[in-house]
């Protein structure tokens, strides 16, 4: 039986970087790690709740966190930052307030920076969110996957692989559908493979979306 390994962890330190950048004493490590997860979840949930609609999606590629003694610096890499900074920046200010209220008062200063992703649909998280939004709006599976591959190809990628599992198009029996375009060398460590999993909440149940994107090779 084949054993599957997460392609991000497999390449960590080679073509993939850590999302959290800090050092902590052993007694504080677990608390800081949980706090990082809370920060990321708070940001993602805020974007989905306030910025996502039938015509657009949040477009978060990743959240990176750096800690110093009296400073927590958060970088939100987002494909469509205009959705967050419109209305004179009220969206970003409200987000900062929500994150600040969730943190420990002794953590010090909080700084949130918004970084625009140059090619949004070259990021698997953004592309998976697009697919989920289309499937939740009852767009056919074939049309959705075809459009997603077209958007990814516009980002100058070398290959993409998509897996969608569940009750596709409302069928009674769950199944798995695959789509692949170009090269996706999962066994090559020097190949820069980005990967994500994203659930889509449809009226027929939850669909699981997995995407692998091959960007370049070192």
Curated annotation (Swiss-Prot):
Keyword Chloroplast: yes
Major subcellular site: plastid
Listed GO biological process terms: translation
GO molecular function: rRNA binding; structural constituent of ribosome
SUPFAM superfamilies, A to Z: Prokaryotic type KH domain (KH-domain type II) (SSF54814), Ribosomal protein S3 C-terminal domain (SSF54821)
A Pfam family it matches: Ribosomal_S3_C
Keywords: Chloroplast, Plastid, Ribonucleoprotein, Ribosomal protein, RNA-binding, rRNA-binding
Cross-referenced InterPro entries: KH_dom-like_a/b, KH_dom_type_2, KH_sf_prok-type, Ribosomal_S3_C_sf, Ribosomal_uS3_bac-typ, Ribosomal_uS3_C, Ribosomal_uS3_CS
Gene3D superfamilies referenced in this protein's UniProt entry, alphabetically: 3.30.300.20, Ribosomal protein S3, C-terminal domain
GO terms under cellular component: chloroplast; cytosolic small ribosomal subunit
Localization of this protein: Plastid, Chloroplast
Organism superkingdom: Eukaryota
Domain KH type-2 positions: 47-118
NCBIfam families: rpsC_bact (TIGR01009)
Record family assignment: Belongs to the universal ribosomal protein uS3 family.
HAMAP family, alphabetized: Ribosomal_uS3_B
Subunit structure: Part of the 30S ribosomal subunit.
PANTHER family: 30S/40S RIBOSOMAL PROTEIN S3, SMALL RIBOSOMAL SUBUNIT PROTEIN US3C
Stated name of the protein: Small ribosomal subunit protein uS3c
Protein species of origin: Cycas taitungensis
Organism ancestry: Eukaryota, Viridiplantae, Streptophyta, Embryophyta, Tracheophyta
Gene name per UniProt: rps3
């Amino acid at each position: 039986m084949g054993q599957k390994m997460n392609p991000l962890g497999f390449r960590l330190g080679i073509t993939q970087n850590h999302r959290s950048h800090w050092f902590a004493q052993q007694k504080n490590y677990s608390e800081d790690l949980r706090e990082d997860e809370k920060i990321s979840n708070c940001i993602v949930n805020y974007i989905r709740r306030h910025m996502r609609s039938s015509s657009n999606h949040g477009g978060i590629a990743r959240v990176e966190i750096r800690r110093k003694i009296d400073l927590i610096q958060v970088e939100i890499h987002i494909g469509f930052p205009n959705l967050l900074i419109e209305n004179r920046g009220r969206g970003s200010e409200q987000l900062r307030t929500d994150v600040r209220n969730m943190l420990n008062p002794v953590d010090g200063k909080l700084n949130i920076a918004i970084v625009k992703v140059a090619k949004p649909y070259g990021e698997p998280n953004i592309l998976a969110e697009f697919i989920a939004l289309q499937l939740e709006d009852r767009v056919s599976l074939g049309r959705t996957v075809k459009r997603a591959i077209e958007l990814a190809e516009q980002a100058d990628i070398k290959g993409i692989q998509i897996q969608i599992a569940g009750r596709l198009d409302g069928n009674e029996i769950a199944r798995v559908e695959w789509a692949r375009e170009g090269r996706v060398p999962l066994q090559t460590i020097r190949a820069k493979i980005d990967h994500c999993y994203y659930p889509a909440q449809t009226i027929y149940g939850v669909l699981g979306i997995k995407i692998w994107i091959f960007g370049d090779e070192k």
